[in-house]
Amino acid sequence: MKPFNFNEGSREQTRREAVARARFHRWQAPGRARVEHPAHGSVVVPHASNLAAILNAAEVWRCNWVTILDAKVWAADPSEPVAKMPLHI
């Protein structure tokens, strides 16, 4: 028996919306971090945690975040410009 408000696409839609909200909030973090990687270079991204900074840098570099876990995350100067949130997701 299915709930009254259940439809086949509701779980996928709910998950997509949750992922989009998490991504939006990750990019709105007030902190700044410089993420450096030997193969991809360096980028300044919003920073709520080191993992969030790596996730944001992976989006900018268009790579899987698991492949850049060896990246270094450093505190960035507040005057440095932050990379824009990519639209390609």
Q: Would you name each region that the model predicts?
A:
Residues 41-48:
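Short, contiguous acidic and Ser/Thr-rich linear segments
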Residues 48-69:
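A short, charged, amphipathic alpha-helix used as a generic interaction element across diverse proteins
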